[in-house]
A protein has these predicted regions:
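Positively charged n-region of N-terminal signal peptides that target proteins for export
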Residues: 1-5, 144
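Subset of outer-membrane beta-barrel
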Residues: 21-349
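Sec/Tat signal peptide C-region and signal peptidase I cleavage site
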Residues: 16-20
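Sec-dependent N-terminal signal peptides
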Residues: 4-15
Length: 349
């Protein structure tokens, strides 16, 4: 018991000490998910029961890694925008004495680009842009109600002849109370850039802290999910200098003052993500999510559309689970996610 308590104290101390890290940086792809299920439910973390077998949730919340993921294999593909695409593979393995592990590789391909001279004239040669993340995740249960986990990530970028490398870690804890509420606390991208060949300073990593909660209803197969993103930064409001939402007085040119209640509410809900997951039997799952902050940042004042919403479906076919989702990020296009998961042990005879 003392050993478990010591491990928990170490995890909480690490989370407390990283609040001062920067939010934004070159490595924003570290926060991108390739999981169709995660994308459908808001795109950040899943604060769900860690006694499940869904290896998709492990990359964003390592405290969900458990022995049920042993020999699980997951393949994901994301059709992003234009020629941009992402792919990922995950595999789980459990060792009795030290815990369960999930290894994953995510690769992003941004396409090929023509070189141009200073006047904008294109040349005949081209260059490519890509990035990758190699991740080793570990998770362990300290009790029937409490689990912890961590990710160790190596990230790299190649933009033409420019390259850079970084190392980062995520730490997480998940707690399930007696009323079947699930709570997860995750600190992501604690680390630093190791090297780059195009500037004299180091790029910051996009550190963030997230608090999530979920509740599965007792008499209905519906799970509600709530995530509070960016615990480390309160003010997320961006004042558009182009004033597309008519926030400035046209006569005086001054910013229209909002009430303190309006500012507080706007900031609060920019942190919030809400989602729901409905199980229709054993072989079909429907999902929907809403990200208010994404909607406020990406919406067009002239055509609002469904920006900020995400939705998806999951089906079990034979020994495979197939998940599809779509995230409405902009009125001019939205990414499509597909993930196929299986367990290799199920094919043994």
């Amino acid at each position: 018991m003392r050993k478990k308590l010591y491990i928990l104290i170490v995890f909480l101390s690490l989370m407390t000490n990283v609040f001062s890290q920067q939010k934004d940086g070159t490595y924003n792809f570290l926060n991108m998910t390739s999981s169709a299920r995660v994308a459908a439910l808001g795109g950040t973390i899943l604060p769900v029961s860690s006694w499940g077998v869904d290896i998709q949730a492990a990359a964003s919340n390592p405290s969900l890694i458990n022995s049920a993921m042993n020999t699980s294999l997951s393949l994901s593909y994301v059709d992003y925008y234009q020629d941009i695409s992402f792919g990922a593979i995950q595999f789980g393995k459990t060792f009795n004495k030290i815990g369960s592990f999930v290894a994953s590789v995510q690769y992003g391909d941004y396409g090929d680009f023509y070189y141009s001279d200073e006047t904008g004239v294109q040349e005949n040669t081209m260059f490519s842009v890509s990035d990758y993340v190699i991740n080793i995740g570990w998770g362990r249960h300290l009790s029937k109600q409490l689990s912890i986990g961590a990710n160790l990530k190596i990230a790299g970028l190649q933009h033409e002849n420019n390259t850079s490398f970084a190392i980062a870690t995520d730490i997480a804890a998940t707690y399930i109370n007696n009323s079947n509420w699930v709570f997860s606390l995750v600190a992501r991208n604690i680390g630093s850039e190791l090297s780059n060949n195009y500037q004299s300073w180091r790029n910051e990593l996009p550190f963030s802290m997230l608090l999530g909660a979920s509740k599965r209803l007792e008499h209905l197969p519906l799970t509600f999910i709530f995530v509070y993103d960016n615990l480390q930064k309160w003010d997320l409001i961006y004042d558009d200098p182009l004033d597309l939402e008519n926030n400035y007085d046209p006569m005086t040119g001054t910013l229209k003052e909002k009430s303190k209640i309006d500012v507080f509410a706007d900031n609060f809900f920019r942190h919030m993500i809400v989602a729901g997951e409905l199980n229709l039997g054993k072989n079909l799952v429907l999902r929907v999510g809403y990200n208010y902050g994404l909607r406020k940042n990406m919406i067009s004042p002239t055509k609002k559309g469904a920006v900020g919403f995400s939705y998806g479906v999951g089906i079990n076919v034979y020994k495979f689970t197939i998940n599809y989702s779509r995230s409405e990020m902009h009125i001019h296009g939205s990414p499509n996610f597909i993930t196929i998961t299986t367990n290799l042990d199920s094919f043994k005879f």
